[in-house]
């Protein structure tokens, strides 16, 4: 089965909005063993829509069309589909009735323009939209079924999960055509990773892909075909073994996701004291539902005074070693852990830039500590001088990795090829 997607809308084509629907759809299909083989974006021009429907229907088996089902003049998907097939638009009585009922239930008078949403190509099969006014439908043209969905994300996602995916699986016996495993890496460049893995003899049907989204490089291991899918687990394990410490998570998008998964409902507690990361670690963890089950507190102790008064850092330590030092960050972590007797505490203090660096401690110098009930681990790293935002993101990632390694019973402090570490 050959699956394609056509995204519509001038705002998408012009880059005025990010097409999150397409990314979500492709990922969902991959999770179900189905690969999207082509994606096309078209503006709100009738002739362009007609042309792309006709052209792609000659090559694909099923096409998911997203957008253009609203009531306004620039919503042209139904009209374009009818024209592409050489048939008329007709009012779907069932959907027209549902539109009137919807507005009545909400105590509103239905604008005349909304009846447009009930006009479908003559041969169309209505596809239910249980949460909106845009009527979905599917039409057979040439070799392809074209499946039309609204652009509103929550309507689109529900229709795909409840209508499109079951239709595809039933009609095309789809599934288990492709599988994907992901390895998240930290502290090594994309080209270096590729050079390391180039010598591997991969089984037929297995290919590698790389995605850089700092501070991580994601290695994607694709398997196409039954035999390749069977070998996928062993190949992924071999890659992870080759790369060693740089692999920090399997099938996760970030280290904060990995830490959340490990700590959520685990009975383990965490406190965080942040200076240069400015609440980033806490914010990232709070972004996950359920983080209250393990996150005791997040303290942004930016000034020296707050480090002393809130965390109990010794003024003498600050005078002798400075805010960006192993000694200070260790006291920060110990103080944060002690407040609520947390199992663990992370602390960061550094120079994110663009100013504030010295010859001894240039921009990108960051001290990070992990306090446990049995002691404290710490390191001071020199990050590549990039943006202030990037220094904060890499610092957070290294802090998460220290905690991850402690949870795994591994060495907490390890070398990263792209991150220098100061000697203690």
Curated annotation (Swiss-Prot):
SUPFAM superfamilies: CinA-like (SSF142433), Molybdenum cofactor biosynthesis proteins (SSF53218)
Cystine bridges: none
InterPro entries for the chain: CinA (IPR050101), CinA-like_C (IPR036653), CinA_C (IPR008136), Competence-induced_CinA (IPR008135), MoaB/Mog-like_dom_sf (IPR036425), MoaB/Mog_dom (IPR001453)
Domain of life where this protein originates: Bacteria
Pfam families: CinA, MoCF_biosynth
Record-linked NCBIfam families: cinA_nterm, molyb_syn, PncC_domain
Protein family membership: Belongs to the CinA family.
Protein name in UniProt: CinA-like protein
UniProt organism field: Shewanella amazonensis (strain ATCC BAA-1098 / SB2B)
């Amino acid at each position: 089965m050959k699956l394609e997607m056509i995204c519509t809308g001038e705002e998408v084509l012009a880059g005025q909005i990010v097409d999150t629907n397409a990314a979500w759809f492709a990922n969902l299909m991959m999770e179900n063993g189905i690969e999207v083989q082509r994606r096309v974006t078209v503006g709100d021009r009738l002739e362009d829509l007609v042309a792309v429907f006709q052209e792609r229907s000659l090559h694909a088996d099923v096409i998911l069309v997203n957008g253009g089902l609203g009531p306004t003049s620039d919503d042209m998907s139904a009209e374009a589909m009818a024209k592409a097939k050489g048939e008329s638009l007709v009012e779907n009585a069932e959907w027209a009735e549902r539109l009137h009922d919807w507005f009545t239930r909400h105590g509103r008078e239905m604008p005349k323009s909304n009846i447009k949403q009930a006009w479908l190509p003559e041969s169309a099969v209505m596809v239910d939209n249980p949460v909106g006014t845009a009527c979905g439908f599917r039409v057979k043209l040439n070799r392809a079924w074209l499946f039309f969905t609204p652009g509103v994300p929550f309507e689109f996602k529900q229709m795909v999960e409840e209508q499109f995916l079951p239709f595809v699986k039933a009609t095309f016996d789809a599934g288990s055509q492709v599988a994907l495993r992901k390895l998240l890496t930290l502290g090594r460049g994309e080209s270096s990773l590729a050079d390391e893995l180039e010598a591997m003899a991969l089984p037929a049907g297995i290919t590698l892909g790389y995605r850089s989204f700092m501070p991580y490089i994601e290695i994607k291991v694709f398997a196409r075909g039954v035999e390749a899918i069977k070998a996928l687990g062993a190949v992924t394990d071999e890659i992870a073994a080759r790369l060693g410490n740089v692999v920090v998570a399997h099938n996760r998008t970030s280290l904060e996701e990995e830490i959340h998964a490990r700590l959520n409902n685990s009975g383990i507690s965490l406190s965080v004291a942040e200076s240069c990361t400015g609440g980033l670690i806490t914010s990232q963890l709070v972004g996950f539902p359920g983080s209250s089950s393990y996150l005791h507190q997040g303290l942004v102790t930016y000034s020296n005074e707050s480090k002393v008064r809130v965390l109990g850092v010794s003024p003498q330590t600050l005078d002798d070693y400075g805010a960006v030092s192993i000694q200070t960050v260790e006291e920060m972590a110990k103080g944060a852990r002690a407040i609520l007797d947390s199992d663990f505490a992370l602390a960061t203090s550094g120079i994110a830039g663009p100013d504030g660096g010295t010859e001894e401690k240039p921009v990108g110098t960051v001290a990070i500590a992990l306090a446990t009930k049995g002691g404290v681990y710490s390191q001071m790293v020199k990050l590549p001088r990039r943006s202030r935002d990037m220094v904060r993101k890499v610092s957070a990632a290294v802090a998460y990795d220290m905690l991850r390694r402690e949870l795994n019973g591994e060495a907490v402090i390890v070398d990263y090829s792209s991150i220098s570490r100061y000697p203690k």
